[in-house]
Amino acid sequence: MTDFSNWSCEYHTTFDEIVRIENKFKEHLKVDKRTRRRLLECCSKDFEILKFKGLHGIPCYQIEKINVNIEIISLNGLNTNNNGRLTEKWNPDRIGNFDFASYNKREKLLIDKETKVLLSWISGLKLENEDIMEFPNPLIKINSEFNSYIIETCNFCYLTKELLVYSPKSSLDELMPNDLNKNFEKLENEKIIQCELNFNQHYSSEILPFLEFKPYRTILFLNNFLIEVNMNGISSQNIPEKTKREFINWNYENQSEINTSWDINLWSKVFDEDYNEIEFLKLKTPNEIITEDVIENFKSYNSKRFKVYWKLDKNETKKLEWNPIKSYISKNLTTKILLNEKLTKQNEYTIKKPELNFKKILYNIIDLIDIENGTFGSLNLVLNNKIENSFQDPLTKNDESSSINVEKEISESTLQINTSMIPHKRSYIDEELKSILEIKRKKKNLNDRNLKDSEDKTGSILSFINQGIITNIPRDTVLSDRQIVSDQTITESNQLPKFGLKIKFNCKEIAGKTVILNGKKIRENHKIKNILENKSQIKILEKELSYDCDFILNATTCLVRIKLDNFFQISKNGYLFYQKKLMDLTTEFKRVLVLVEYSSIIESTDKDIFWKLHLYLKNYQFYTYIIPSNIEEIARKISLLISRYSSKYNDNELDCNSSEEQILQSLNFNIFLVKDILKKFTLFDFLKGLTLNCDNRNQNILTKQQLARIKTLLTLEW
């Protein structure tokens, strides 16, 4: 069945009368046997309905007769004898008597009464002005703007004639006036088969004889047969031989401009994310001739006409380092780098700081345990070589024999030292243990006797540690006699000095040297600042620093003050009181000067705390100085260190005005370090030397964390 809901026919401007059929609703139709036969005749594919716009914009349909060539091919592979060629001229009188020899399949349809009445009304339509309809050539596809459809089982697209008029015998309005109004909201189940039709545009009668149409092919699936229809237009004398029909064309503008230079095009692709760097050196056109055709072939990369060549020889490709981006940046990167504040704020970086592990003293390694009294023994400063910065006093003739005997006893006892190292945990005492304890007692008594005899030569443990640290100066730096003057020089007689050092300052050498005072520590250091400025004429700049130090002496050296009373206290996180503070300073400075301030009470009550502190701070980056908590003594010590490590600067020399200085300072470098770097290198040479690892001078002034910070800056996405 076919959908009649939107069918309408109108009067055309060149014809007398056209029947106007309007039905805006869908309904169920019942078809009788006679109507089914006529519907079957419409399926013969001898008609075509042309769709056009009539008066008032109402769609109209016009029936056209065409000549078709039908070839029926069985889908199941069986040959049929129903192949035929229908080329007879259409005769309107043949309606109802046409022999459909090419169609064997028939189907019974159920049609209700209303459908019968409608079909009987359609059969009552008759032709008028038949002379106009006798065209020498029937119409086929008139325009390219049409919709092509495939019909399922019943193609109700052909009525009896091209032009229809309304017959006054029956009226559609009189037949169903009330049914559609009542059932308007109830028409939900549509049983009419959906038909897909072939519609073309309608032309006036003046243009129709002069049109010629190209042949086209239509394939229909009708039951088990594949019907292939070739539709050809038949020319006549009145129609021109050739009529050109042009389709709608539009211009396409390509916005991408092709580079005239092949190399420039390749260089531009270096910064493309999806571009492969191997392709940069592999692509080459034959004979280096670059045209638009070659570029188009390059776009179709897999085409056989375009061949890919290596841009370099085989020997050169073997030696080639496949990193064209790196070479391009090294050649074309300008030395001018501007500071971007957004980079320093948004791109935050974190560096894992190395943990500072203090070495612990095991009680069974150093012979300082007195088992009988349950206390620690005194430290042997003369004969013990295990402690760093120790000092050996030359032995006299009377002591040579005793020292030899002691050394023999020690060598004999080392053979049996693994048998029992923890005697106080044993439930019994054997003979081997007694022999070991006797050797230790003899050694201890001998050391006590030597210390009592040489009271003038020995000083307190504190002065010894201080003297040992000062004498443990690297070979590169030598102290002059003007800076340190002791009671007896160490080089002439290797005798331990008495407590305290007599320090003299040469104001001419110290005056004008510049240091930086941390603005966060002004309350603790304001008295020391006044002493240094008034007596030593040292320039002190006050700036708030991100480091937890008191003074910055040069690019790689800082000074920090700590108190001995708080050193061995443990914080909430399980570390020592100053451990995290000292760990942070080792990441920013190659040398950390630690001034440990103590009170006189500690010296008299707990003497062992000094050498314990010294062993805890046994690190190559720490330079430990133990001094009493006296402001004048602290100022003298600081002025001595300033004269050794600091240098002179002008007033305006430490201002950071250039963009290069601001970049380095944004990396948390101190001002002295920034000035020293830019005196030796430009910023470009400095960064280039770090990336290529060609200059070791940078690594001598920077810590590992500072080097890692610069490398993370270079690897950021700009």
UniProtKB/Swiss-Prot annotation:
Recorded GO CC terms: chromosome; nucleus
Localization terms from the record: Nucleus; Chromosome
Principal localisation: nucleus
Record-annotated disulphide pairs: none
Coiled-coil regions listed in the entry: none
Keywords of the record: Cell cycle, Chromosomal rearrangement, Chromosome, Chromosome partition, DNA-binding, Meiosis, Nucleotide-binding, Nucleus
One annotated GO biological process: meiotic cell cycle
Protein family according to the UniProt entry: Belongs to the ZIP2 family.
The protein's name in its UniProt record: Protein ZIP2
Species annotation: Vanderwaltozyma polyspora (strain ATCC 22028 / DSM 70294 / BCRC 21397 / CBS 2163 / NBRC 10782 / NRRL Y-8283 / UCD 57-17)
Upper classification of the organism: Eukaryota, Fungi, Dikarya, Ascomycota, Saccharomycotina
Gene symbol of the encoding locus: ZIP2
